[in-house]
Amino acid sequence: KREKNMQSISIITNPTTENLVGRSHWWGAPDLPEDVPYPYVMVDDTQVVMGSTGMPKRDIHGNVIIEHGEDYPEPLTFICQIRMEDVAPFDKEGLLPRKGMLYFFAAIDYFLGDSSPIEIPLHGPVGDMVRVIYVEDVPDDVQPYDLHWEDTGESIFRPAEEITFYEGVESSETHALLSIPYQDEVSDSYPRHIALLQVEEDDRWGLHFFDCGSLYLLIRPEDLKARRFDNLQCEVFTY
């Protein structure tokens, strides 16, 4: 576990009309280079056939009838992108890269009040439901990723918010990078981990982790230094 009294990096977000391309921002569209694909999860479209009574249909042998559809890709929700140069002055331990961009994606639509066939695990390894992408050299001409819903033609992305970083305390109750969960139940369950990203509830976004809670994407400091962003644990803590 990291040394005590080390500071996290707190994140404050605010709505803005400014152009945030190439900058740190929350929500909005990620500025992914052309050779970096947007992360999707393949969904098995197998469904139980329902009858008019609301009960599953069954064949003559009493077996529930299953309808097999085609697998389809479901995009992960883009949470934020962090420009490494913005946070370098606050990263006293040198855990994060010093240049480039870090992009966070996760299947959190359910917690935003939307329906989705995919959802982050409440505890344990993130599997395919979280992707953290690090790009060391971001091209100067990078553009926001363009992705729309097929049925409406509307962008899948929420309005972008600008980010202000400042030195936080070790256990922060704000969105944060490099924090230690302030709930003992979480920090005790992951004694060798820190929160690469900590996400708190926000009524403005309709973001709620059940009655009241927090989302942690946890990583061991040695994995962070080795840039092993695939070796993450997820913890959705709720009171």
For the regions a protein language model found, what residue spans apply to each?
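Short, Lys/Arg-enriched N-terminal segments with co-localized hydrophobic residues
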Residues: 1-5
